[in-house]
Regions:
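Active-site bordering "gate/hinge" segments
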Residues: 1-268
Length: 271
């Protein structure tokens, strides 16, 4: 006998999605996804100056910010056969790469992690063993006993002092949580680190696009002047700062995010 399960709304994408799944003998035989909201952006931009459309379509979302605006200016440029300057293309690529990294880190840690990381279990972890687990995954400088002791204290404080903390309410202790306490502690430490990474990487968009979310774009190029001697333009100080942000983010991705994604997927697959 076929059973249909409906999840409506899917809460972690702002509630604009409905999912249906047909299950027969414990196996999903069919599935359907439905977008349940129209924002009317296409209607809003109708008959407007094509050079201004990027500013409207970008407001469709404040999370996946900038990509809608970028697609808009590229569409206008393609239609008019405009070839933008190489520097403008580089700036756009840097901005989009920054938000892509932020999205991946956010999705993995903030939107997924607590589905399989037990916060309460982490409070019972041995920081020494947690450090050993972390050191087996990468050479990240923070993989120390003292670091995980401090993280454990911070999490306990969150839970004990704020009833509104996201750590204060959950299905903690449910048998579906299978990860060892030490792995949970490592994951929660990286969860908190990911918040700092997100805060830093979006500065690339702010420096080149003026703000985040919804940075500025321009049909035909980018609205940011480059002058190494002007404090109000893209000078060497700002460009070096961007390079530092990129380097720090690369370190986090290579030594934290990627090892976590691979190892936790492996652990879940072998439960």
């Amino acid at each position: 006998m076929t059973k249909r399960i409906v999840v409506d709304p899917i809460t972690r994408i702002e509630g604009h999605l409905r999912m249906e799944a047909d299950i027969e003998n414990g196996v999903i035989t069919d599935a359907f996804s439905t977008g349940t909201m129209i924002r009317g952006i296409e209607i809003i931009v109708k008959d407007r100056d094509p050079r201004d459309v990027w500013a409207y379509v970008g407001r469709v979302c404040g999370v996946c910010t900038s990509i809608h605006s970028l697609c808009s200016v590229r569409a206008v440029e393609d239609a008019l056969h405009i070839v933008i300057p190489p520097n403008a293309e580089q700036v756009r690529n840097l901005m989009q790469s920054a938000i892509t990294i932020q999205d991946h880190v956010t999705h993995f840690y903030q939107l997924q992690a607590l589905d399989w990381v037990d916060v309460m279990s982490a409070l019972n972890a041995d920081p020494r063993k947690a450090a050993e687990v972390a050191q087996s995954l990468s050479e990240w400088p923070k993989n120390s006993i003292g670091y995980f002791v401090e993280i454990q204290k911070k999490i306990r404080t969150f839970i004990e002092t704020s009833k509104f903390s996201i750590f204060s309410n959950g299905y903690w202790g449910h048998p579906a949580y299978k990860l060892p306490p030490e792995v949970n502690l490592v994951a929660l430490a990286h969860y908190l680190e990911a918040l700092e990474v997100q805060k830093e990487i979006v500065k690339v968009q702010t420096i080149f696009g003026g703000k985040n979310p919804h940075p500025n774009f321009l049909v035909g190029g980018m609205a940011c002047a480059v002058n190494i001697n002007d404090p109000n333009a893209l000078n060497m100080e700002r460009l070096n700062y961007v390079a530092q942000i990129i380097e720090r983010t690369q370190t986090f991705v290579r030594q934290v995010y990627l090892p976590d994604a691979v190892s936790y997927t492996h652990l879940r697959a072998h439960e």
